[in-house]
């Protein structure tokens, strides 16, 4: 009889672990999506800067007179 009571508890523990894992995976996926959105925004800003003023942008990185 005691073994019959242990199985549901073990199954319940596994279910709770599965739920915790699923929650963690969902949070990680959401964070990855947020980071991708931020990166896309940064790349869009760079692209628009290059489209409107590429020469000035490049010149800001070029050293002059051996500096």
Swiss-Prot record:
Short name of one Pfam family: Pup
Single Gene Ontology MF annotation: protein tag activity
UniProt feature, compositional bias: Low complexity: 1-36
Region (Disordered): 1-38
Entry keyword Chaperone: no
Cross-link (Isoglutamyl lysine isopeptide (Glu-Lys) (interchain with K-? in acceptor proteins)): 67
Pathway: Protein degradation; proteasomal Pup-dependent pathway
Family membership noted in the UniProt record: Belongs to the prokaryotic ubiquitin-like protein family.
Domain notes: The N-terminal unstructured half of Pup provides a signal required to initiate unfolding and degradation by the proteasome but is not needed for pupylation, while the C-terminal helical half of Pup interacts with ARC to target proteins to the proteasome.
Purpose of the protein: Protein modifier that is covalently attached to lysine residues of substrate proteins, thereby targeting them for proteasomal degradation. The tagging system is termed pupylation.
Assembly and oligomerization: Strongly interacts with the proteasome-associated ATPase ARC through a hydrophobic interface; the interacting region of Pup lies in its C-terminal half. There is one Pup binding site per ARC hexamer ring.
Protein's recorded name: Prokaryotic ubiquitin-like protein Pup
Organism: Bifidobacterium longum subsp. infantis (strain ATCC 15697 / DSM 20088 / JCM 1222 / NCTC 11817 / S12)
Gene expressing this chain: pup
